[in-house]
């Protein structure tokens, strides 16, 4: 798709947005220095939109749609992308699903054709359902065998309980084993509606040309479906208290995740929370990394994580250590968390954390794929584009006083925790951990 020479070069570099009939949005960002183009169809539906009886449906469907369409087999789809040296893939998260392609700019029409065909026309054929069911069950088994992956799911379940955010994106072996073709087809029909979809592209792309391609390949699907958009599952307050979960497993290491519930991504102190997370365990100079690993050598892997959803979130700490060092790791971790809750972080720590966030943000947007992802996520989450400059200003405006107020507010909350390792009972776990969970 050749680009027209713009009268205003600065305007040509600004992201553009078009809303088509039915609510489907097209957002693009032209990057003059690249030859590639990345395009993704972002659907505002994820694992939290599933009922308990179809847990894992969003992820199962994502797999299934690639198996065949009325005009292409799975091999046809793969060969078409391989023939141009591109990448075609998808992923499912708690609140969205994305189908994307990365190609040369000249091959963008093919990429849009393939992605649209998969998203709109995937057949969910009976034979395909059974084959892909086995693939997903293997993926679940592989995830269960990875302590870090398994623990991540265990932790969110311990923190959020029966709330949909607490369920694994991938579902369970039990739910996937009994899921029917009819349930998957219904999920596709009711959830993959144009008002939930964003087509995002970045790189060597022309906005008007992409809009024309979307009109061509989405066609009649651009109008609203006959059924109303199903409401999001699990919005609002999380019921129940965080808890402690233990999976006893014969392993060389003990793996632990513990953390607290936080407000969602729309919280006014969202960036102060990110600074707090970074100062706690987001880098090599963070409190936890320095105290647990560098000073005492108690663990190789120790870090914090921050997961933010529409209406809730989780700030967590992960560590893996020899079982005989578990009590010491928990003692030091508890001391760090209590110290930060009581005394806060220093001005210097705040400055380092802000610099880390700024640098990570900019360095993470050096290619068309990451730019496309930012466009799609921003449109789904906020209904508009949030520029990098806007985010950098938000980070810069964070003060150490705001961070420490957030720490006092959140770190005194009741913790949820998950432990995986060679421990026979919860009573055998370190007292510091049991005290934090309450």
Curated annotation (Swiss-Prot):
GO MF term list: metal ion binding; metalloendopeptidase activity
Keyword Aminoacyl-tRNA synthetase: no
Cofactor note: Binds 1 zinc ion per subunit.
Residues the entry annotates as binding Zn(2+): 59, 63, 139
Cofactor: Zn(2+)
GO biological process annotation, one example: proteolysis
Active-site residue numbers: 62 (proton acceptor)
EC number per UniProt: 3.4.24.-
Any single GO CC term annotated in Swiss-Prot or TrEMBL for this entry: plasma membrane
Keyword set, alphabetical order: Hydrolase, Metal-binding, Metalloprotease, Protease, Zinc
Pfam families: Peptidase_M16, Peptidase_M16_C
Keyword Disulfide bond: no
Family membership: Belongs to the peptidase M16 family.
Entries under PANTHER family matching the protein: METALLOPROTEASE, MITOCHONDRIAL-PROCESSING PEPTIDASE SUBUNIT ALPHA
Annotated protein name in UniProt: Uncharacterized zinc protease Rv2782c
Organism name: Mycobacterium tuberculosis (strain ATCC 25618 / H37Rv)
